[in-house]
């Protein structure tokens, strides 16, 4: 069986997670006042944790867009002229519904018992690129934003692969958000659409390190069964 991009990143996370478990690592918590903790627990939190891009030493696709004056416009299902991407929904996962980020093309969340502690999610964002785009440059810079995440510890530098017949780059590891050690698997796919318009597909898998065994089969399913029609 071919190991495709997102599943490869998840496998990298698994290796990192085993190391963390062996060291007795666990997510840390901030020293917040008791009343603040009570208030936070009473307010429903979104199942898809937001991720804010962080500045860092590694060059990124966003930086390339700024320098090359390229505009990225979010694309949603059914938008005229856009590629059609059919993602499978793996066993034990459901559509994110109202928790889907406004700019996302598609999102799913884990609905198993392990999600009671923290909800693993996989989010796909599709963007139409306007300007003079170098597709290979997108692949070369794909890992930058992931490597710039706070406290990122990668399992290697990432690898090139493909999804649905289109070139991709994947990277996985762990990072720290709000005092918690988290696992991440990111994949960037470059799609040559109609009239040679370039689209950028980004897949972001999010979980805690000890939830990777649950997330891994889902990423394998997505990598093996996703179809892309330009």
Describe each PLM feature range.
Residues 122, 196-206:
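Short, well-ordered beta-strand elements
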Residues 139-190:
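Signature of long, low-cysteine stretches enriched in small and polar/charged residues
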Residues 106-110, 183-194:
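Short, surface-exposed beta-strand/loop micro-motifs that present aromatic residues
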Residues 82, 117-121, 166:
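Extracytoplasmic
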Residues 2-104, 206-230:
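N-terminal targeting sequences that direct proteins away from the cytosol to non-cytosolic compartments
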Residues 115-118, 162-164, 192-194:
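Extracellular/periplasmic catalytic domains that process cell-envelope and extracellular macromolecules
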Residues 125-131, 143-149, 176-178, 187, ...:
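Post-signal peptide N-terminal regions of Sec-secreted extracellular proteins
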Residues 108-137:
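A short acidic-to-branched-hydrophobic micro-motif
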